[in-house]
Amino acid sequence: MKKILHNGDRYMLELKDFEAAADRLKNVIHNIPLSTSATFSAMTGAEVYLKYENQQKTGSFKVRGAYNKIMKRYAEGDLHAVVASSAGNHAQGVAFAASSVGVKSTIVMPRSTPIAKVSATQGYGADVVLAGNIYDEAYAKACEICEATGAEFIHPFDDEDVMAGQGTIALEILRDLPFVDMIFVPAGGGGLISGVAACAKQINPRIQIIGVQAEGAPAIANSFRAGERKPS
């Protein structure tokens, strides 16, 4: 059983959680097989494979976590409305998942969000509220809406069901490439890499999980070095 640190508490994600998430996502998301990269293989002297989640439904891996969270809560019978804060990919994932089960969704986006992303989110059935100039301000507004309406907030990464959904990527990688040595994962908020690592390591503890984060926003790298959560 893997333990994932969360503000002094611990998320407990077992392999069965990822398998349950995969069942919920079956026949919903696209099956995207691994693709070999001749260029990167030549550059590194290793066999390099790519998983193009930009070709996923709604254009991002984010739909995995959002759909798993919303479907799990919907099955429990007490989900009537959801709220999320996002500048794009999570917004579309939540909107798509909510509309799939007829649940009202409200997405709070910063005013600087490109109109194309606003329109795409509305196209999946969400009500969009523009608030603030940065994500933190949109997040604060989303929390206000939840407080006022009783809707449930769908966090983009700090949620075990969201992590379980994102971690289904690891199940697919190991299905297609059982003897993979290393998995490189982009790291932003940490939901994707947490899910992938927790899932993959339970199947094969020898797999190395390498997080890659932008130098200009190294919150996870700083947190690992400090042994506690640190901002960028």
Regions found by a protein language model. Give the residues of each.
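PLP-dependent amino-acid enzyme catalytic core
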Residues: K2-S232
